[in-house]
From Swiss-Prot:
It is found in: Cytoplasm. This is Phosphoribosylformylglycinamidine synthase subunit PurQ. It catalyses: N(2)-formyl-N(1)-(5-phospho-beta-D-ribosyl)glycinamide + L-glutamine + ATP + H2O = 2-formamido-N(1)-(5-O-phospho-beta-D-ribosyl)acetamidine + L-glutamate + ADP + phosphate + H(+); L-glutamine + H2O = L-glutamate + NH4(+). The gene is purQ. Residues 5-225 form the Glutamine amidotransferase type-1 domain. Signal peptide: none annotated. GO terms for molecular function: ATP binding; glutaminase activity; phosphoribosylformylglycinamidine synthase activity. GO terms for cellular component: cytoplasm. The active site is at C89, H198, E200. Disulfide bonds: none annotated. It comes from Synechococcus sp. (strain JA-3-3Ab).
Amino acid sequence: MAKVRFGIVVFPGSNCDRDVAWVTRGLLGCPTRLIWHRETDLSGLDVVVLPGGFSYGDYLRAGALARFAPVMGSLAEHGARGGYVLGICNGFQILTEAGLLPGALVRNANLHFICDRVGIRVERQDLPWTSAYPCGATLTLPIAHGEGRYVCDADTLKQLQDRGQIVFRYAPVAPNGSVDNIAGICDPSGRILGLMPHPERAADPDLPGQDGIPFWQSIVQSLAG
């Protein structure tokens, strides 16, 4: 069985790239390449991850500068060719800034940085990202963000709801004020996913809280199968 090949983009200010690599390479045994933001070669990769952190210091707003990095053009092409793209926290913010996912991530409703473990409900179980979870399962995953409140206009929200693009919701309620309790969404194809919670921070078998492990197992099993 062929191994799923991961690429993890590293921006100045990224701080979760090694955490993701520990899971993909160390836990799952998948070939994993760290990709500097100035690189443009994404050939041979199945899944490209935009990790959490504070890309370019999050100056202007989260993800606003990272969208112009040389790697982002190649990332869009990777997605258009049918490749898989995952944005976690700051990565989700970058995907919305780049127009690869709709809506925006703005300041939390309480105007404070939130670092906590929260309930996350799985709304779609039929995606490669979530196939190892039962639909409707409630997970406990870490969040850590100051600009994590998902917003969009009414028409976009209706489209997300009607097309089944809401993959994760906060449960019972969004701590950051996200519209419709949205914690993660995908594009219409289901291949591009952005979420604010950190599944890589809940994937160490030696630490309490392992609800993130099935997330990573899902994409590996789906693509390898």
